[in-house]
């Protein structure tokens, strides 16, 4: 019996990709942390910065660590990711809608 060395699965990232992702993640974490700790801006600006940095950090993690891209051979990964985002969005928006309606209806009486 011989052992096959053929790896037909998805390729792993390089050290450069992992280090780039790690450094970007640190930067995207330190900036909002610094803004909150020093009070560098108004609360609305800080909240906007935190949300923007969080979205960018999610994208960095998806690309650098989870190797999500639009290549055709990884189409199923992207399809599964889009489906997951859709389901989470439905759950979050639906939950907020239900809580808002409950609050509105309970306060009427």
From Swiss-Prot:
Record note on disruption phenotype: Increased reduction of the ubiquinone pool (in aerobically grown minimal medium with glucose).
Domain of life: Bacteria
Residue intervals on the Cytoplasmic side: 1-17, 65-80
Membrane topology: Multi-pass membrane protein
Subcellular location: Cell inner membrane
Protein's GO biological process: aerobic electron transport chain; aerobic respiration; electron transport coupled proton transport
Short name of one Pfam family: COX4_pro
Intervals, Periplasmic compartment: 37-45, 100-109
Record-linked InterPro entries: Cyt_c_oxidase_su4_prok (IPR005171), Cyt_o_ubiqinol_oxidase_su4 (IPR014210), Cytochrome_c_oxidase_bac_sub4 (IPR050968)
Residues annotated as transmembrane: 18-36, 46-64, 81-99
UniProt GO MF annotations: cytochrome bo3 ubiquinol oxidase activity; electron transfer activity; oxidoreduction-driven active transmembrane transporter activity; proton transmembrane transporter activity
Assembly description: Heterooctamer of two A chains, two B chains, two C chains and two D chains.
Primary role: Cytochrome bo(3) ubiquinol terminal oxidase is the component of the aerobic respiratory chain of E.coli that predominates when cells are grown at high aeration. Has proton pump activity across the membrane in addition to electron transfer, pumping 2 protons/electron.
Family: Belongs to the cytochrome c oxidase bacterial subunit 4 family.
Protein name, as recorded: Cytochrome bo(3) ubiquinol oxidase subunit 4
